[in-house]
UniProtKB/Swiss-Prot annotation:
Functional note: Part of the bacABCDEFG operon responsible for the biosynthesis of bacilysin, an irreversible inactivator of the glutaminase domain of glucosamine synthetase. Catalyzes the dehydrogenation of the C7-hydroxyl group in the 4S-tetrahydrotyrosine (4S-H4Tyr) to yield anticapsin (epoxycyclohexanonyl-Ala).
The encoding gene: bacC
Gene3D superfamilies to which the protein is assigned, alphabetical: NAD(P)-binding Rossmann-like Domain
Biological pathway: Antibiotic biosynthesis; bacilysin biosynthesis
UniProt protein name: Dihydroanticapsin 7-dehydrogenase
Molecular function via GO: oxidoreductase activity
Organism: Bacillus amyloliquefaciens
Reaction(s) catalysed by this chain's protein: L-dihydroanticapsin + NAD(+) = L-anticapsin + NADH + H(+)
GO biological process terms, semicolon-separated: antibiotic biosynthetic process
Amino acid sequence: MNLTDKTVLITGGASGIGYAAVQAFLNQQANVVVADIDEAQGEAMIRKENNDRLHFVQTDITNEPACQNAILSAVDKFGGLDVLINNAGIEIVAPIHEMELSDWNKVLNVNLTGMFLMSKHALKYMLKSGKGNIINTCSVGGVVAWPDIPAYNASKGGVLQTDAFYRPSIIAKHNIRVNCVCPGIIDTPLNEKSFLENNEGTLEEIKKEKAKVNPLLRLGKPEEIANVMLFLASDLSSYMTGSAITADGGYTAQ
């Protein structure tokens, strides 16, 4: 895949899909910088992986100076930045008529504004270096709205509009590509927590019920989304920009 010695910055990389991506890129001999708000998880990841190619920087992606610092940390640590993966995200379950404004703003600030801030400062570096690759973690919720998570759906719909954010026709001239992946329901710790908080039954029972929504009749694995990210980061996808890959077990094809 030709990712050896490439430097990849992953937001929300200390758990779930992000952590699976960290491991996938390390396996390809890439340098990986994780920007995550959870310092304890980040430090635990560093100890577990014990890899000189991995670096952690505690980052609140809703804070612009913190985002700028994350980009600079990647450049200072490994000498450049080849790939930015905007993966950090949250969801709050509540129908729109019951959702607090503070919760609405929190979701949009992390999922949408955080992506904007990280991309803004990554692009400043990539435009100067004449190359780069941005991968955004969207969601099926940005294509077909999930019930009772209106802020999440709205934020991911914004993420999907890569043309509006990045103007691929302009930045492509500088050898910069931008694409996104739209996962379906993935078996992550964050989703497990949400399942138990918002459904009745055991975790195993809830997972079986959730799996029925797509033709493959199972939840996705974080590693399966990480594999899509590897493809988008590599030369195998060199003719792709402004595209979205849906990995949802066939949910949106029904």
